[in-house]
Amino acid sequence: MPKAKFFEGNYPENNNSEQEFVEKYIKDKNFKENWTILHSTNIHDPGAGSWKTHGELDLIFINHKYGFIHLEIKGGGYSVEDGVWYKRDKGVKKRLVKEQEPVQKLEVKERLLRNCFNNIARGKSGFGDRLKNDEVKLLPIVSFIVWVY
């Protein structure tokens, strides 16, 4: 079984969730399929011109057969009460504004990722030299939040 091509980025300070997930499930692991995995990747929609559409994605799994799987890794501290999201910060429970809720942020990042790859597939440059236009096909993108406690 092949190992994934893993491009490791920087881990967030004061948050071990991503690193623990990578160590447990990705690094030095064998996969049944050939995957390219990008960690902590900054993206920009090349079709947006000068608009600021930057975003950081925790993990992107890329496979020619299955498409793109986008994972956002979240540690503890989140809770939901009556549809309202909260995050515990330094022991204090704070209500999150709608734009900062994990599901909302995931949807925004998935839309940015979809636009980025669709524009690259149409010939716009993107993702530096990691992906070439002819390597990107219009494949499905699936996004998940992974809760690590």
Where does each model-flagged region fall?
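Intrinsically disordered, low-complexity Ser/Thr/Pro/Gly-rich regulatory segments
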Residues: 1-149
